[in-house]
Amino acid sequence: LAEGYSKEDICGGLAYSIVNNYLDRVVGTRAVGEKILFQGGVTHNVAILTAFKSRLGKEIIIPQFFSVTGALGAALLTMEEYYKTKVQEEILEDINQEELVEKLFLRNYTGAIDKQKRTIGIPRVLFLQKLFPMFNIFFSELGYNVVLSEMTNEKIVKLSQEYSLDETCYPIKLVNGHVASLIEQKVDYIFLPSLYTMKHEVSKMREDYACVYMQTIPKIVSKVMGLEEKGIKLLSPALSFNFGKKYMMKTLLKMGLSLHKNPIKVVQSLKKGMKALQEFEKGVEKLGKDLIEKLSKDEKVFVIITRTYGVVDKGLNMEIPKILKKMGYKVITLSHLPAHSMDISNEYPNMYWPFGQHILSGAKIVRNSENLYAIYLTNHGCGPDGIISHY
């Protein structure tokens, strides 16, 4: 003022100095886009806004609530941190549930080896992912050591590749790897049944056949692995649940007698095994029920739809459920839905594959539920899956 400059020039100079200071010291050498969002309390100063327009020559957009965008940003960051913590708690809860299922599965399993006893190896594959609690008790009560193969890991996958001769589906290829890992542990027997039918109480289907590989897997493994040459006996009873409990008792009694066990002891051991399986199934069912009850009606949930062993085996599901949970999504599986208690024989009378019945039942439940979204997991080379995916 003393030198004769007007107030307008001085204010304009201050406005330009603020703009130049920001561009030189804050923006620096970084590129400036074609559209600029101008926000914060400084936006009230029209002189600074005009100086920015003059200096940059670009479009400047002013949001409606420009003076409180900082507060809005702080609120968004707070909300993000809150839900991040909440998601972590939910992930821990889900992990805890997985651990509880694993504890139920292995409740009566020790893996201890008594050198005075012979050892039976059970591969952790296919339907044995569900039936193991029964056969673990059965063989333990008959006086055997029981060894369960590990969860599918890199070593087992490599062994599967080494011993796979025919072009089969991935779950069947993994059987070779699991059996090979048991052979390395020098077991005396490999227990791997044939599964012909799997009847469920509510099903009114004309037939309930397992796939051809489940029916023939013991023969495939015996040939590929050369069990007889290695001095390992294969125990492969033919399981057919369609024929009822009496048939199952008769089949497993025959196997027990081939092991030179007392028939009364065999029956007693089998009953204890069946009880253990029922307890396992009820325990898993309760965990699933508790999880679903915690979900709100409008909460969006992913449902993993696949076969039982596809849900349990991380090598088959590629840990997709875990990845989704880490992303903050709620995830449940087909076993958490009442799919096993639905009869779809009127709609699909020729769906002879039991797993297919469950998958279609689950898909029907998801279709009729606004908050459920299905993720269908299949494995390379599965024939029935190739057909079901078109439904």
What are these regions (language model features)?
Residues 45-47, 70, 383-387:
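Short active-site-adjacent structural elements
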Residues 26, 47, 55-56, 69-86:
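Hydrophobic/aromatic-enriched cytosolic interaction surfaces used to assemble or bind macromolecules
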Residues 53-72, 143-155, 334:
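Conserved phosphate-binding/catalytic loops in two-lobed NTP-binding clefts
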Residues 17, 28-55, 66-67, 127:
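Glycine-rich phosphate-binding loops at beta-strand->alpha-helix junctions
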Residues 13-15, 37-42, 61-71, 150, ...:
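Active-site nucleophile and cofactor-binding loops and adjacent substrate-binding regions
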Residues 1-23:
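Adenine-nucleotide phosphate-binding core of ATP-dependent small-molecule kinases
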Residues 77-391:
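An N-terminal assembly and electron-transfer interface module characteristic of large anaerobic redox
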Residues 32, 57-58, 227-230:
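Short, well-ordered coil loops that connect the C-terminus of an alpha-helix to the N-terminus
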